[in-house]
Amino acid sequence: MNGFLNQSRSIPGGRVFMVSGDSMSPKYPSGARVILERANEDSFIEWGAVYVLDTIDGEILKRVYPTDDPAVIECRSENPAYPPFQVKREWINSWWRVRMMFVLG
């Protein structure tokens, strides 16, 4: 599915994921790796930043924004072909802030 990720390996203090699909292209192309740092949702979420959200439906890479309802966030793709959608905070198991992206070969 577009926007979903496959974990490739873990590193101390963070995680590395491989981007799958084109919903976050061109900035995050399919096959790119993103280095993630776990975020504490209770202390600070940087709205408009890119996160991997570990949800009850799987992991998604999206730019996150607040909504009028504090129990819900809006997730946006980089690719304008994919419309924004909302996710209930209670469906999110963990938040991972994207700190770096690299493309191999």
Predicted region positions:
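Acidic/glycine-rich C-terminal interaction modules and beta/coil loop segments
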Residues: 7-105
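Sequence-specific dsDNA recognition surfaces
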Residues: 1-7
